[in-house]
């Protein structure tokens, strides 16, 4: 797993990690945040590598499907882009309406 994938998973986990079980959160954190291999996670938890892989795969599926439905990560990035391109005192009524409309989508 490359750095870009790890960052994307960390972002998804920040938004939707509460939807995972404590066990899934723990395994995903060990694998992604602590950069442990499947074997290292399995040794640490005393479970098979296949069980670790299944937990990671199921966790990632949950996180990705939730983003596909809710689009919170995408909307947040778009809002930050809109705001970044405006000086704080330049957010006029049209921009406010654009932001509100975007949030309501």
Regions found by a protein language model. Name each.
Residues 48-49:
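Helix-turn-helix DNA-binding motif, specifically the short coil turn and the N-cap/start of the second
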Residues 60-67:
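C-terminal flanking helix
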Residues 55-58:
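Residues within the DNA-recognition helix of helix-turn-helix
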Residues 40-45:
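Short alpha-helical "recognition helix" segments of helix-turn-helix
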Residues 69-81:
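Short, basic, alpha-helical segments at the C-terminal edge of helix-turn-helix-like DNA-binding modules
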Residues 80-105:
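Helix-turn-helix/homeodomain-like alpha-helical modules used for DNA recognition
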Residues 4-17:
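Short, Lys/Arg-enriched N-terminal segment that forms or immediately precedes the first helix
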Residues 22-34:
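Short amphipathic alpha helix immediately N-terminal
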């Amino acid at each position: 797993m490359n750095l870009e994938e790890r960052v994307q998973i960390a972002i998804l986990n920040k938004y939707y990690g509460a939807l995972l079980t404590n066990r899934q959160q723990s395994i995903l954190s060990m694998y992604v945040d602590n950069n442990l291999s499947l074997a290292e996670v399995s040794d640490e938890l005393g479970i098979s590598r296949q069980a670790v892989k299944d937990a990671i795969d199921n966790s990632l599926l949950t996180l990705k499907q939730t983003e596909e439905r809710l689009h919170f990560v995408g909307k947040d990035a778009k809002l930050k882009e809109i705001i970044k391109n405006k000086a704080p005192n330049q957010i006029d009524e049209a921009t406010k309406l654009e932001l509100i409309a975007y949030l309501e989508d």
